[in-house]
Amino acid sequence: MSQLLPLFAALLLSALLPAHAAEPDVTRLLADADRFRVSDEQLVIETRVNTFKSDGTPDKERLYTVHTSTGRRSLVLMRSPAEQGQKVLMVGDDFWLLMPGTQRPMRITPSQKLLGDASTGDIATLRWSEDYTATLVGEERCENVACWHLNLSARRAGVSYQRIELWLGRDRHLPLKADLYLQSDKLAKQARFVPDSVERPTQIDEMVLRDQLSNHRETRVRYTAREKRAVPESWFNPMSLARNPTLE
């Protein structure tokens, strides 16, 4: 009987201790995070990009209208006077730049800069769940809240970043911050995500990018308006865009 007492004590202690929470489904975590950034498959997002010098002095501002659609497709229309009429089209891993007065789309890379440290891939508002495979690093404390730390590996070579370290709020899976790495595994940028509300966030209103390679300048990508709207399929064809520059 005396030999059974330690066993009974161990069983009783294990019953009283809190059970470890099951690890979350990383696929669901990533899909939830995307919903704060791109809530619908077909959206029009009005975007303002501001750059700041390393001392915090405002530098430049640009305006963009971004059309997102199914099949990893985005069309970026440049609205500022210095870029008026220029367009960037993304279809899958292919990116094209269309200039006013030309009928030949130019291929570019998703990492090519549009303004400051905002690249074509950043402005195009890509979905992490479509382009990356996620693994759970663990639960951590970040931004004064409990977070899930994910490691995202690119599924293809055509994305802006080959690896992303992403931190999501533990309860709502709200994106909080990210480290963005190039194919060489160099840390290119650090991103911080600003929601529309601290208490009850429904969407990301701003992404703040800080360069980690050279000038340490700051670029703020602010989403000023979102609207669910489908556009003609021809808008996602580079040759059709070249023939119809006014999108009439």
Protein language model annotation of sequence segments:
Residues 44-75, 79-81:
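N-terminal, post-signal-peptide region of Sec/Tat-exported proteins
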Residues 6-16:
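Bacterial N-terminal signal peptides
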Residues 53-55, 101, 183-184, 213:
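Solvent-exposed strand-loop boundary residues in beta-sheet-rich modules
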Residues 1-2:
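N-terminal secretory signal peptides that target proteins for export/translocation
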Residues 18-20:
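Signal peptide processing junction and immediate N-terminal pro/mature segment
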Residues 22-42, 48-49, 57, 82-84, ...:
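Flexible, processing/modification-adjacent segments and terminal tails
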